[in-house]
A protein has these predicted regions:
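DUTPase catalytic domain/fold
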Residues: 1-387
Length: 387
């Protein structure tokens, strides 16, 4: 049964040994206890297996530049310094590419001293090449909310490829709550893999998380006429420029051909990423997240500046899991090249999937009864496009 947020306050307490990510029912209890506040009522489906969807407020501020408030300044104070104009989101408005907007969120926090939080774009947001991060008052980092934080939350939004139509209540980001440290090290990850087979690779590397490579062969590679190598399979999509607007609430409303160019495998198993272009690719490996765990995709090498992989990094309990309707799912990779052309090769490691324990198994798993868009996925665009 899906956890929803009731109006009656309930106590939220933990044993000393309770470390990890809060599941859906504990997120609901945290809200009921006053740890998560909202200007308007919470809505059905807002609580996910290991996260809470965050909703945009009624106004967006276009600002001159992205910023962090720093340890002594609030976000509102920085908005006053950098604001160009306001955009009313009540009935919907278009956020243009190349612009930076700050939107106060409907949710705010009054966290207990032992609970911290982390935010990330939702999958559909990242697949639209919408760069979004959550900011809290008096902080030095994006998407990171310190334990015990009391205050508002804001979304920084910068559409990179497609202009987007958003409105009050649109959900572009999600937030996880955690108590203590429960990330699995290489030994614990290897032991879990021996039981659950987390990845369909015989030579899986667990150092720093499960290594994830890029698939440049495609699901149905075609043999070449000379009998060597492979080629021809669909490996991904490259975003088109100067397209129409994408309404973030419109599911299956857009023709893929109007927004994306399909890309097919090359015989040499390489792909040249063009500067400042956006690609949707898939992982070579199929992965799964068992019910008692959550995962996050992190960069393989944060110092590698040639391209960025995966805006939206959260993987919920049950992702790709056989008991939740999956058969192992491939991670969809949102890839943006930077200043120079860069060649990537089939199987090249582009990220690592870091696993973390849940404090308890969620009531609802990804893919079971929550309308999950990407369970048992292969290469897949966001839910906005009909295929």
């Amino acid at each position: 049964m899906r956890a929803e947020i009731a109006e009656t306050p309930v106590p939220l307490s933990f044993a000393a040994a309770d470390k990890g990510i809060l599941p859906d029912r504990m997120i609901a209890a945290l809200a009921q206890a006053g740890g998560i506040l909202s200007e308007v009522a919470f809505v059905p489906g807002q609580v996910q297996p290991a996260s809470l969807d965050l909703r945009l407020g009624s106004v967006a501020f276009r600002v001159r530049a992205s910023f962090l408030p720093g340890p002594r300044t609030t976000v509102a104070e920085r908005i006053d310094e950098l604001k160009l104009h306001e955009v009313d989101l009540t009935d919907g408005a278009v956020l243009e590419t190349g612009c930076v907007y700050i939107v106060p969120l409907l949710e705010s926090l009054a966290l207990p001293g032992d609970i911290a939080a982390a935010a990330n774009p939702k999958s559909s947001t990242g697949r639209l090449d919408v760069f979004t991060r959550v900011i809290a008052d008096k902080t030095r980092g994006f998407d990171s909310i310190r334990a015990g934080y009391h205050g508002p939350l804001y979304a920084e939004i910068s559409p990179k490829t497609f202009p987007i139509l958003v409105r009050e209540g649109s959900r572009l980001s999600q937030i996880r709550f955690r108590r203590g440290h429960a990330i699995l090290d290489a030994d614990a990850l290897s032991a879990l893999h021996a039981i659950e087979r987390l990845v369909d690779a015989d030579d899986a590397d667990f150092d720093g998380g499960i290594s994830v490579g890029v698939d440049l062969a495609g699901p149905d590679p075609l043999p070449l006429s000379d009998g060597e190598g492979w080629g021809g399979g669909l490996i991904g999509y490259r975003a088109k420029r100067h397209t129409g607007v994408v309404d973030v609430e419109r599911r299956g409303g857009y023709d893929v051909r109007d927004f994306w160019e399909p890309m097919f495998a090359r015989a040499d198993g390489t792909l040249i990423l063009d500067p400042d272009e956006f690609y949707i690719l898939a992982s070579k490996e199929a992965v799964q997240v068992p019910p008692g765990y959550a995962a996050e995709m992190v960069p393989f090498d944060p110092l590698m500046g040639e391209f960025r992989v995966h805006y939206a990094g959260f993987f919920d309990p049950g992702f790709g899991y056989a008991g939740a309707g999956g058969r192992g799912s491939r991670a969809v990779l949102e890839v943006r090249s930077r200043e120079v052309p860069f060649i990537i090769e089939h199987g090249q490691i582009v990220g690592r999937l870091v696993y973390e324990r849940m404090i308890a198994r969620p009531d609802t798993l990804y893919g079971t009864g929550i309308g999950s868009n990407y369970q048992a996925q292969g290469l897949k665009l966001s839910k906005h496009f009909k295929v």
